[in-house]
Amino acid sequence: MKKGLVTTIVIAVVALGIFSWVKSTYNGMVEGEENVKSAWSQVENVYQRRADLIPNLVATVKGYAEHESGTLESVISARARATQITVDPDKLTGDAIAQFQSAQGELGNALGRLLMSVEAYPELKANENFKELQAQLEGTENRISTERMKYNETAQSYNTTIRSFPANILASIFGFEQKGYFKASEGADTAPKVEF
Protein backbone atom coordinates (compact mmCIF):
# COMPACT_ATOMS: atom_id res chain seq x y z
CA MET A 1 0.00 0.00 0.00
CA LYS A 2 2.76 2.42 0.96
CA LYS A 3 4.77 1.47 -2.14
CA GLY A 4 1.76 2.14 -4.42
CA LEU A 5 1.21 5.56 -2.85
CA VAL A 6 4.86 6.53 -3.33
CA THR A 7 4.74 5.37 -6.97
CA THR A 8 1.56 7.37 -7.58
CA ILE A 9 3.07 10.49 -6.03
CA VAL A 10 6.27 10.12 -8.10
CA ILE A 11 4.23 9.65 -11.31
CA ALA A 12 2.05 12.65 -10.42
CA VAL A 13 5.09 14.85 -9.73
CA VAL A 14 6.76 13.79 -13.00
CA ALA A 15 3.52 14.36 -14.95
CA LEU A 16 3.08 17.77 -13.32
CA GLY A 17 6.69 18.65 -14.18
CA ILE A 18 6.20 17.64 -17.82
CA PHE A 19 2.91 19.53 -18.02
CA SER A 20 4.53 22.64 -16.52
CA TRP A 21 7.41 22.45 -19.00
CA VAL A 22 5.05 22.00 -21.99
CA LYS A 23 2.85 24.87 -20.81
CA SER A 24 5.80 27.19 -20.18
CA THR A 25 7.50 26.35 -23.49
CA TYR A 26 4.28 26.67 -25.50
CA ASN A 27 3.42 30.01 -23.90
CA GLY A 28 6.97 31.24 -24.55
CA MET A 29 6.63 30.36 -28.24
CA VAL A 30 3.23 32.09 -28.42
CA GLU A 31 4.73 35.19 -26.80
CA GLY A 32 7.65 35.10 -29.23
CA GLU A 33 5.34 34.79 -32.23
CA GLU A 34 3.21 37.69 -31.00
CA ASN A 35 6.36 39.79 -30.54
CA VAL A 36 7.31 39.06 -34.16
CA LYS A 37 3.83 40.08 -35.35
CA SER A 38 4.04 43.27 -33.32
CA ALA A 39 7.47 44.09 -34.76
CA TRP A 40 6.12 43.42 -38.27
CA SER A 41 3.21 45.74 -37.60
CA GLN A 42 5.68 48.51 -36.74
CA VAL A 43 7.57 47.87 -39.99
CA GLU A 44 4.34 48.19 -41.97
CA ASN A 45 3.46 51.29 -40.00
CA VAL A 46 6.62 53.19 -40.94
CA TYR A 47 6.41 52.11 -44.57
CA GLN A 48 2.81 53.37 -44.62
CA ARG A 49 4.00 56.69 -43.20
CA ARG A 50 6.44 56.99 -46.10
CA ALA A 51 3.69 56.14 -48.59
CA ASP A 52 1.44 58.78 -47.00
CA LEU A 53 4.12 61.48 -47.45
CA ILE A 54 4.54 60.81 -51.17
CA PRO A 55 1.35 62.48 -52.50
CA ASN A 56 2.28 65.74 -50.76
CA LEU A 57 5.86 65.52 -52.00
CA VAL A 58 4.72 64.81 -55.57
CA ALA A 59 2.22 67.69 -55.46
CA THR A 60 4.89 70.09 -54.23
CA VAL A 61 7.41 69.02 -56.86
CA LYS A 62 4.78 69.05 -59.62
CA GLY A 63 4.21 72.76 -59.10
CA TYR A 64 7.88 73.57 -59.72
CA ALA A 65 9.23 70.81 -61.94
CA GLU A 66 6.84 70.44 -64.84
CA HIS A 67 9.53 68.76 -66.95
CA GLU A 68 9.89 65.87 -64.48
CA SER A 69 6.55 64.21 -65.27
CA GLY A 70 8.22 60.86 -66.07
CA THR A 71 9.99 60.83 -62.71
CA LEU A 72 6.80 61.82 -60.90
CA GLU A 73 4.83 59.08 -62.66
CA SER A 74 7.45 56.48 -61.73
CA VAL A 75 7.14 57.51 -58.06
CA ILE A 76 3.35 57.33 -58.20
CA SER A 77 3.32 53.90 -59.86
CA ALA A 78 6.02 52.56 -57.49
CA ARG A 79 3.93 53.79 -54.56
CA ALA A 80 0.87 52.01 -55.95
CA ARG A 81 2.81 48.74 -56.32
CA ALA A 82 4.35 49.04 -52.86
CA THR A 83 1.03 49.65 -51.14
CA GLN A 84 -0.61 46.71 -52.95
CA ILE A 85 1.80 44.16 -51.50
CA THR A 86 0.77 43.01 -48.06
CA VAL A 87 2.20 40.21 -45.98
CA ASP A 88 0.04 38.11 -43.69
CA PRO A 89 1.62 38.33 -40.20
CA ASP A 90 0.93 34.61 -39.77
CA LYS A 91 3.02 33.84 -42.87
CA LEU A 92 6.17 35.93 -42.49
CA THR A 93 8.28 33.73 -44.73
CA GLY A 94 11.54 34.78 -46.31
CA ASP A 95 9.90 34.87 -49.76
CA ALA A 96 6.99 37.03 -48.59
CA ILE A 97 9.36 39.50 -46.93
CA ALA A 98 11.63 39.54 -50.01
CA GLN A 99 8.64 40.39 -52.23
CA PHE A 100 7.57 43.15 -49.85
CA GLN A 101 11.15 44.43 -49.61
CA SER A 102 11.51 44.45 -53.41
CA ALA A 103 8.39 46.59 -53.89
CA GLN A 104 9.49 48.97 -51.14
CA GLY A 105 12.96 49.10 -52.69
CA GLU A 106 11.47 50.16 -56.04
CA LEU A 107 9.65 52.96 -54.27
CA GLY A 108 12.81 54.02 -52.47
CA ASN A 109 14.73 54.10 -55.76
CA ALA A 110 11.99 56.16 -57.44
CA LEU A 111 12.03 58.61 -54.54
CA GLY A 112 15.81 58.85 -54.82
CA ARG A 113 15.53 59.70 -58.52
CA LEU A 114 12.89 62.32 -57.73
CA LEU A 115 15.03 63.96 -55.07
CA MET A 116 18.03 63.95 -57.43
CA SER A 117 15.98 65.68 -60.14
CA VAL A 118 15.03 68.40 -57.65
CA GLU A 119 18.65 69.56 -57.66
CA ALA A 120 17.91 71.32 -60.97
CA TYR A 121 15.21 73.49 -59.33
CA PRO A 122 16.77 75.84 -56.73
CA GLU A 123 13.47 77.61 -56.04
CA LEU A 124 11.88 74.25 -55.17
CA LYS A 125 14.78 73.35 -52.86
CA ALA A 126 14.19 76.67 -51.07
CA ASN A 127 10.43 76.03 -50.67
CA GLU A 128 9.60 75.58 -46.96
CA ASN A 129 6.93 72.96 -47.62
CA PHE A 130 9.38 70.92 -49.70
CA LYS A 131 12.11 71.21 -47.07
CA GLU A 132 9.67 70.06 -44.37
CA LEU A 133 8.51 67.10 -46.48
CA GLN A 134 12.11 66.18 -47.25
CA ALA A 135 12.97 66.26 -43.53
CA GLN A 136 9.94 64.10 -42.71
CA LEU A 137 10.90 61.66 -45.43
CA GLU A 138 14.46 61.46 -44.12
CA GLY A 139 13.17 60.83 -40.60
CA THR A 140 10.83 58.16 -41.91
CA GLU A 141 13.68 56.40 -43.74
CA ASN A 142 15.60 56.32 -40.46
CA ARG A 143 12.56 54.85 -38.70
CA ILE A 144 12.22 52.23 -41.42
CA SER A 145 15.82 51.16 -40.89
CA THR A 146 15.34 51.01 -37.11
CA GLU A 147 12.09 49.04 -37.28
CA ARG A 148 13.52 46.58 -39.79
CA MET A 149 16.45 45.99 -37.44
CA LYS A 150 14.08 45.48 -34.48
CA TYR A 151 11.97 43.08 -36.54
CA ASN A 152 15.05 41.03 -37.50
CA GLU A 153 16.17 40.88 -33.86
CA THR A 154 12.71 39.75 -32.72
CA ALA A 155 12.44 37.17 -35.52
CA GLN A 156 15.93 35.87 -34.70
CA SER A 157 15.03 35.42 -31.03
CA TYR A 158 11.79 33.62 -31.94
CA ASN A 159 13.50 31.40 -34.54
CA THR A 160 16.21 30.46 -32.04
CA THR A 161 13.54 29.48 -29.51
CA ILE A 162 11.57 27.25 -31.87
CA ARG A 163 14.70 25.60 -33.30
CA SER A 164 16.33 24.82 -29.94
CA PHE A 165 16.02 21.35 -28.47
CA PRO A 166 13.68 20.23 -26.94
CA ALA A 167 11.38 23.19 -27.75
CA ASN A 168 11.69 22.29 -31.44
CA ILE A 169 9.65 19.14 -30.75
CA LEU A 170 6.77 21.17 -29.36
CA ALA A 171 7.14 23.77 -32.13
CA SER A 172 6.73 20.99 -34.67
CA ILE A 173 3.74 19.49 -32.87
CA PHE A 174 1.96 22.83 -32.48
CA GLY A 175 2.86 24.20 -35.93
CA PHE A 176 5.19 27.07 -35.03
CA GLU A 177 7.19 28.01 -38.13
CA GLN A 178 10.33 30.06 -38.65
CA LYS A 179 9.92 33.71 -39.63
CA GLY A 180 11.81 35.35 -42.48
CA TYR A 181 14.28 38.21 -42.21
CA PHE A 182 14.90 41.47 -44.01
CA LYS A 183 18.11 41.20 -45.98
CA ALA A 184 20.51 43.86 -47.19
CA SER A 185 19.82 45.17 -50.68
CA GLU A 186 21.81 43.64 -53.49
CA GLY A 187 25.15 45.39 -53.79
CA ALA A 188 24.96 46.84 -50.27
CA ASP A 189 28.15 44.98 -49.36
CA THR A 190 30.15 46.91 -51.98
CA ALA A 191 31.29 50.42 -51.16
CA PRO A 192 30.39 53.01 -53.79
CA LYS A 193 33.27 54.32 -55.88
CA VAL A 194 33.97 57.96 -55.10
CA GLU A 195 36.13 60.03 -57.42
CA PHE A 196 37.23 63.63 -56.99
Describe the function of each predicted region.
Residues M1-F196:
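A helix-centric hydrophobic-segment signal that preferentially recognizes long
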